[in-house]
Swiss-Prot record:
Pfam families hit by this protein: S_layer_C, S_layer_N
Location(s) in or outside the cell: Secreted, Cell wall, S-layer
Similarity comment: family membership: Belongs to the Mj S-layer protein family.
Stated name of the protein: S-layer protein
Top-level taxonomy: Archaea, Methanobacteriati, Methanobacteriota, Methanomada group, Methanococci
Function: S-layer protein. The S-layer is a paracrystalline mono-layered assembly of proteins which coat the surface of the cell.
NCBIfam families, A to Z: S_layer_MJ
Length: 567
């Protein structure tokens, strides 16, 4: 997917935690200089001896690589701490801005002689285009979005990517595909809003009229797509099913259930995805809860499974039903725990049964047609030939599939906007009005932080960063709180003023400090370079510098992964 390199501000991982960020890719990187000695000195006796610097113009993947390194360095700061519950709290914060309308009142705008515009941004700009075949807004031109009729293309504004909106690149990691499409899926968040001129209707944008955001005309949504499809055609959208992963308000969630009896969409945070053996080891959720496969029986070509949720050894919820890996599933929701069982089978001798499942906690329930948070109602989103239609029903069929969820603003109109104003979108993103000398710039922005608690080995995706708790180093007597380092931008650091060793993420093209080193002949990294870890000894006010880079963002990410493995 195309990624704009100019908008993301910073991603930092900190708080009271012992965690490292999960990175993927090969662990091998070319080493230049004494990289091992540099890595060994990064943290000594619990003290951090490095600053981490990422380029202001870096791609999002470089920023996440910097956050990954910061998280690993932070984990090394901990020598002892409370180990009573075997988990840790991680804070992930991020900021970003979309493109903007430089001056909504400019008479030169294509929409200047109109009185409404529809603004759209998403986690990736592949989803945002208005031209034929380019994105969700293109599909919606002249159609219905929620219950709003989208205007012609001149009044639909592609604000491209708001990069700290969340996306899930693999929405079906277990390959369940219960509708038999033989497709892979992805999912992404988007935000949209309608800006109107103040009434009367004759007050057009080019008259400098007051602006307003009206009830029912601001939106947050999470939509599912077939892989590498971006919403410009009806066939691009993917039907939600239990077990699918989608982002919701910045965190990757599992669709646990579309409850058609009570019209609920139930989501949960994954804690386990795999197979549980009948009368084998129960899956321990902590706090006295465990999941048990009590029995698996053959029923013709399918199987029936008896799955139980235990609390302190006693059954508190259970289901015994047919499952076949082809649409017949078992779902259990009890308090804040959600379980989806997709398939079951027996060993060759018929001695033991097995059940494939995903287990979730921190269950979130959206009551469709009702306020999820103050002034924001929850809806299912159905993909039809008429557009993306809101629904207060959880019913989803092949003909009229539910392809996402949305929150719609139902508060009072926000009007008489002539000066600086920020409109909150679901307490998550913002629509920002910035007036300067009679010009009114408009854009989406985010400045958000999420606290997540992880058990050892658990990973989460939050605000487009993937975090994994590798280990907890502690004793039960004393807790030593620490704060992990936060990656700086190159504009906030310099070689001449460094008082610690520096880790520079990104090569000379995107990191100005790396460019300084390259201009001095201290490093040699270009677009053809492999994943590289290069030390420039004494190059920063007498301190050493480690450049983590490669010829492209994937090679830079691979170099970061190699460094994390060394720390």
């Amino acid at each position: 997917m195309a990624m704009s390199m100019k908008k993301i501000g910073a991603i930092a991982v900190g708080g009271a935690m012992v965690a490292s960020a999960l990175a993927t890719g090969a662990l091998a990187a070319e080493k230049v200089g004494d990289v091992d000695a540099f890595a060994a000195n990064a943290v000594t006796n619990g003290n951090v001896n490095v600053d981490i610097v990422v380029g202001s113009n870096a791609a999002a993947k470089d920023v996440v690589s910097a956050a990954n390194i910061a998280a690993k360095v932070g984990s090394l700061m901990f020598k002892e701490g409370s180990a009573t519950d075997g988990n840790a709290k991680v804070t992930v914060s991020a900021s970003s801005k979309s493109d903007n309308i430089k001056n909504i009142w400019d008479a030169g705008n294509a929409f200047a002689a109109t009185n409404e515009v529809f603004l759209f941004a998403a986690a990736d700009d592949d989803y945002t285009g208005t031209a034929a075949g380019t994105g969700v807004p293109n599909y919606l031109l002249g159609k219905t979005f929620m219950d709003y009729t989208v205007p012609p293309a001149a009044q639909v504004i592609d604000l491209e990517d708001l990069q700290t909106l969340a996306a899930v690149s693999d929405a079906d990691p277990s390959g369940w595909d219960i509708f038999g499409t033989n497709k892979d899926f992805e999912a992404a968040e988007a935000v949209a809003a309608v800006i109107r001129t103040q009434q009367p209707a004759a007050a057009l944008f080019n008259t400098g009229a007051d602006l307003q955001v009206s009830e029912d005309e601001a939106f947050y949504m999470s939509l599912a797509f077939e892989e590498d499809k971006y919403g410009s055609a009806l066939a691009d959208y993917a039907r939600l099913f239990p077990g699918m992963r989608i982002p919701f308000l910045g965190q990757e969630m599992v669709v646990v259930k579309l409850d058609t009896d009570d019209d609920l969409v139930i989501l949960g945070k994954e804690v386990y995805d795999g197979v549980v053996k009948q009368r084998g080891d129960n899956y321990d959720l902590g706090n006295g809860y465990a999941v048990k496969v009590n029995n698996v029986l053959t029923q013709g070509a399918a199987y029936k499974a008896d799955v139980q949720l235990l609390k302190d050894g006693k059954v508190v919820a259970s289901k015994f039903d047919t499952i076949d890996g082809n649409g017949n599933q078992i779902t259990i929701v009890y308090k804040d725990i959600g379980i989806v069982v997709n398939d079951a089978w027996e060993d060759i001798g018929g001695n033991y049964g097995f059940a494939e499942m995903v287990i979730t906690k921190d269950v979130v329930t959206l009551e469709l047609g009702e306020e999820y948070i103050n002034d924001w109602e929850a809806y299912a989103v159905r993909a039809t030939a008429a557009g993306l239609i809101e629904s207060d029903s959880a019913t989803s069929t092949a003909a009229v599939p539910v392809v996402g969820i949305a929150l719609k603003y139902v508060g009072d109109d926000v009007d008489k906007i002539r000066k600086d104003k920020t409109f909150s979108i679901a307490n998550y993103a913002k629509l920002d009005f910035d007036e300067d000398s009679g010009d009114m710039a408009v854009q989406f922005l985010m400045d958000d932080a999420k606290d997540v608690t992880l058990s050892i080995g658990q990973k989460v995706s939050v605000l487009n960063a993937e975090i994994k708790l590798n280990e907890l180093m502690a004793d039960a007597k004393q807790s030593v709180p620490m704060t992990a380092p936060i990656a700086k931008l190159d504009a906030e650091a310099s070689l001449s003023a460094a008082n610690k060793d520096l880790i520079l993420v990104g090569g000379p093209v995107v990191n100005t400090l790396a460019k300084e080193l390259a201009d001095k002949g201290l490093i040699a990294i270009d677009n053809a370079s492999p994943a590289t870890l290069a030390v420039a000894k004494g190059a920063a006010n007498g301190k050493d510098v480690l450049v983590v880079a490669g010829g492209d963002r994937d090679k830079t990410a691979a170099a970061a992964t190699a460094l994390i493995a060394m720390l």
